[in-house]
Amino acid sequence: MIIDITEIMDWIPHRYPFLLVDRVLKIDPNKSITGIKNVTVNEPQFTGHFPARPVMPGVLMVEAMAQLAAVLVAKSLGSTKNKEVFLMTIENAKFRRIVQPGDTMYIHAVIDQQRANVWKFSSTVTVEGEIAAESKFTAMIKDKT
């Protein structure tokens, strides 16, 4: 099931310049999700990171992983209209390859555990078949107040 940017924006609250998932390529609710982020030189982070040699910040790769996981949570629950997804922990984040404008980040997230409103994930970012980043993280789903 492919999910385009318009539908992604129906499922998560992030918007430009902080929406870091362009398309979902595959989703298996309650299990895993794969999506992409096309990295372009026009993104605001590249004005300062780094002007002479733009490099995607590692923290934004982790954010892309978390946003994709939030889409998985939303699709698994059927809706998050009355819920909010908050990142609680980031563990074992590793950055193994430079990501730069022109690259396509393939992001994959797997649900490792889900108990009540706490969800644990493992995620990777690959570029041209090479692991660029990997991380484990935990998110909490809360009712909107």
From Swiss-Prot:
Active site residues according to the UniProt entry: 49
InterPro entries found in the cross-reference section: FabA_FabZ (IPR013114), FabZ (IPR010084), HotDog_dom_sf (IPR029069)
Enzyme class: lyase
Gene Ontology biological process terms in this record: fatty acid biosynthetic process; lipid A biosynthetic process
GO cellular component, one term: cytoplasm
Keywords: Cytoplasm, Lipid A biosynthesis, Lipid biosynthesis, Lipid metabolism, Lyase
Catalysed reactions, as listed in the record: a (3R)-hydroxyacyl-[ACP] = a (2E)-enoyl-[ACP] + H2O
Subcellular location: Cytoplasm
Pfam families recorded: FabA
Record flagged with keyword Cytoplasm: yes
E.C. numbers: 4.2.1.59
Tree of life domain: Bacteria
NCBIfam families per UniProt: fabZ, PRK00006.1
PANTHER family, per the entry: 3-HYDROXYACYL-[ACYL-CARRIER-PROTEIN] DEHYDRATASE
Family: Belongs to the thioester dehydratase family. FabZ subfamily.
Known function: Involved in unsaturated fatty acids biosynthesis. Catalyzes the dehydration of short chain beta-hydroxyacyl-ACPs and long chain saturated and unsaturated beta-hydroxyacyl-ACPs.
Protein name, as recorded: 3-hydroxyacyl-[acyl-carrier-protein] dehydratase FabZ
Organism expressing this protein natively: Rickettsia africae (strain ESF-5)
